[in-house]
A protein has these predicted regions:
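Core catalytic lobe of class I
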Residues: 1-193
Length: 193
């Protein structure tokens, strides 16, 4: 169901995007389960999404790994690979935590409205740029999401990978001009709005 919608959406995003502008999406690798998939491991959801965009003509522009605390993930998910007892039993079944990714795609062509950080109220100083340019963002607050207090009951809608507001703020600062319209077709719980 997801891929049917997504494969329809990606060409439409390409159609409405200005040349030279960027589209970012937040995702993670998906853990598999013995009950559902027959094995314990990971699915390269990130790679599948990138390939879907590239098939339409998007350029894989950049990506950032967003560090996540494996202890928090272990406490929340009880994933076998993150449990300390697994190291003692058989460390070949242990694994690292799963980070989030911010993947950025670019539509080919020249950007008709460059995004310039000239210091006129929209400056990005060198120290900030050095943090933003890092391939791993370690300073994103994992609890800073709109979902922080929601989705506590079994029948509540849960997101695979809740988007931290700091990631949105950083992407908007880097890649948009004041007054730009930002399209968020899935909108989730409205974090971008």
């Amino acid at each position: 169901e997801f891929y049917a919608q997504f494969r329809y959406l990606v060409p439409e995003l390409y159609r409405v995007m200005k040349p030279g502008r960027l589209l970012s999406f937040h995702c993670m690798l998906l853990p598999t389960s013995k009950a559902r998939d027959g094995y314990i491991g990971l699915t390269d959801f990130r790679g599948e999404l990138i390939r879907t965009f590239r098939e339409v003509g998007w350029i894989h522009h950049s990506e950032v790994v967003i560090w996540k605390d494996p202890v928090t993930a272990m406490q929340r998910t009880k994933a076998l690979g993150l449990l300390h007892k697994q190291i003692r039993k058989d460390s070949c079944m242990s694994r690292q935590g799963i980070p989030d990714y911010l993947i950025t795609m670019r539509k080919p062509g020249d950007n008709p409205e460059p995004v310039s950080h000239t210091g006129e109220g929209d400056d990005i100083p060198v120290s900030m740029w050095q943090r933003f340019a890092s391939p791993v963002w370690t300073d994103i607050d994992q609890g800073d999401t709109l979902q922080r207090q929601s989705a506590r009951e079994d029948d509540d809608e849960k997101h695979i990978c809740p988007l931290q507001l700091g990631v949105i703020r950083r992407a908007m600062k880097l890649w948009t001009n004041p007054g730009d319209v930002v399209l968020s077709p899935f909108a989730g719980i409205g974090s971008e709005g």
